[in-house]
């Protein structure tokens, strides 16, 4: 895990490495338009997406306002679970705090046509999520390189991008694909 026995980082503030986002956009044809990042942090995903899209950033921590406002004028400091913002987005993309992952998935599938979450691969295996995952199956894009969210070496677990599309939401099977490896520099 990211912590490896250490104290948990406040708000699970683990910025998403840009290469993780690049692997996603190389593999998945995401629509343009209005995108929302409901757990935006300081905007690492927004920074990494090279699409020209209209961003809305939502983040609970006030200290993230300034960096987010440099990326989008639509930066809101609030809890995505309690936001009064609309739900007419083309894409919802985030690397949510793991303890809020299911809530983020549910919020995203209501808020956007396409919902994209960077999650531990073992998100597939929970008994608590089994009913949801067997009736609302995502497409799963596995990152073959383990990301480092701390800059101090890689995690000990695998990660994947989980993608739900509103038009295929109620299905029992999704696809799984291992993405291209990122060369070590």
PLM feature segments, named:
Residues 1-185:
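Class I S-adenosyl-L-methionine-dependent methyltransferase catalytic core
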